């Protein structure tokens, strides 16, 4: 097992995904400084209950999902508002064995890193999902800064398409987390088909 700092967020990030974050809480500024000095990373985990920011001493840490993604900082800058901006890239999934409150109220976790999913081409019956992903990227999902940062997507691979679609679809995070925890990228595409169909029917 490994001990890593955890960053609870109301979102799901897969390995290979990139995310821009604005850092303003002291505990996370300290964490980012330490990660950059040690060339280490931290875990992003989805919030199940509770708040992301801690504004009072009495406020409890949020409860989080047991599966997350270990990330590393790939870029940073000082924003116009004076806050630190960072771009992180997901590296590998992990499962949390235990988590607790550390120094500066930073959430720490004892985690086990998981094996990477197998690569598999997109079956013909799911090929249209790659087109949908392209449409989402053009109209919604990835900022110019993230595109410029070198985010690469293989539209022929089930893993890449399923991961990026899950991150970008406008659906509840609990559904995204279920897709995230799946181990078979082709099976994930099948579940995405069902989810998209339900979303279309509910319009």
Language model feature labels by segment:
Residues 1-203:
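N-terminal low-complexity, acidic/polar interaction/targeting segments
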